[in-house]
Amino acid sequence: MKRHPKFPPQPRDLKAAVRRQPAVFTVYLVLRLMVLATLVSSVIRSEYESAFICLLVLVLFMLPFFIQQNFGIELPSTLEIIILLFIFAAEILGELECYFITFPYWDSMLHTTTGFLCAATGFALIDILNRNSRIKFELSPIYVALAAFCFSMTVGVLWEFFEFGMDRLFHMDMQKDTVVNSITSVMLDPTNKNIPVTIDGITSVTVNGQELGFGGYLDIGLYDTMEDLFVNFIGAVVFSTIGYFYIKHRGKGKLAKAFIPTITEEKPDTAAEDMPE
């Protein structure tokens, strides 16, 4: 009889996971304690939105284990640690500690990582099918790498759609603004003949009689969106290239193995087999 894994994890399952991946458990424990400390601090200061984000992070921390237990997928320790660090860096450091504002390239670093990880995910999905003897499905290394790249870029585009929707519907500022000193637009053409007109050397902008004080024109999200997609592109290209050589020279790509999930080998239930019919 086939047993389906349960969630939350049973004590035996959790102990086995700790023994199998001690580094992952250590990182998980340290980050979880830090998030709990932030949660308590947020509640004391009556910052309930921050407290909600902390609770969300604690749930997301369980996601890798949930996937492994319920879908029969084995995540490499390196990949799992990066996922945990990514969640912490994006939500706790980025949002609550304002790293997105303090460090200008924090967002770009996270989007580059996203491109890399999503390419690894797309690569794994196709590669698992490619190696499954029960499925008549065999693709060349270049096609698998290209599909992984496209998967990563699609996720990146969908995320930008989400950011745009949040900004439009809920007046958020997920697509960060950029101060520029030059703009070009056909709307500035007095002849209305679709001729782009450029204004250079912008040092001040007045809105409804109020000086903004940014030292330039405030671009609304375009530069941020394109930069996010570009660094996502870089991350996707890097992993797709690594994945290509991993398939081409099967078994020699140690770097790729550290990021590619695999199907867990199911062990037969000997107790069920020994039962009399």
List each language-model region with its residue ranges:
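Short, Lys/Arg-rich, polar N-terminal cytosolic tail immediately upstream
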Residues: 1-21
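Membrane-interface helix caps and helix-loop-helix hairpins in membrane proteins
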Residues: 43-48, 70-73, 96-106
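Cytoplasmic-side transmembrane-helix entry/capping segments in multi-pass membrane proteins
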Residues: 55, 74-85, 108-111
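Alpha-helical transmembrane segments of multi-pass membrane proteins
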Residues: 61-65, 86-91, 148, 152-159, ...
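Membrane-interface helix-boundary motifs at transmembrane edges
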Residues: 67-78, 134-139
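Interfacial helix-loop-helix junctions of multi-pass membrane proteins
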Residues: 96-107, 156-239
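Membrane-interfacial alpha-helical segments at the cytosolic side of multi-pass membrane proteins
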Residues: 113-130, 168-174, 234-248
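Short, highly charged, low-complexity non-transmembrane loops/tails of multi-pass membrane proteins
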Residues: 253-274
